[in-house]
């Protein structure tokens, strides 16, 4: 799949779940399950409840996503 096929949305982390997954509420009101991107894990960027994040999703499954940026 090409990178152009991803959808990006800003959101807020609502809950921490096991295995580095998070419940994220998007700006449009939808709640999804998201995991951290590999570069965020490698650089040990912490994501806590209440953080504003950028979530990337595929158009095929709009219930799961990947957190690729945490806003400061």
Curated annotation (Swiss-Prot):
Its main location: cytoplasm. The keyword Cytoplasm applies. One of its GO terms (molecular function) is rRNA binding. Residues 1-72 form the S1-like domain. The keyword RNA-binding applies. It comes from the Bacteria. It is found in: Cytoplasm. InterPro entries: NA-bd_OB-fold, RNA-binding_domain_S1_IF1, S1_domain, TIF_IF1. Keywords: Cytoplasm, Initiation factor, Plasmid, Protein biosynthesis, RNA-binding, rRNA-binding. GO terms for cellular component: cytosol. Component of the 30S ribosomal translation pre-initiation complex which assembles on the 30S ribosome in the order IF-2 and IF-3, IF-1 and N-formylmethionyl-tRNA(fMet); mRNA recruitment can occur at any time during PIC assembly. One of the essential components for the initiation of protein synthesis. Stabilizes the binding of IF-2 and IF-3 on the 30S subunit to which N-formylmethionyl-tRNA(fMet) subsequently binds. Helps modulate mRNA selection, yielding the 30S pre-initiation complex (PIC). Upon addition of the 50S ribosomal subunit IF-1, IF-2 and IF-3 are released leaving the mature 70S translation initiation complex. Belongs to the IF-1 family. This is Translation initiation factor IF-1. The gene is infA.
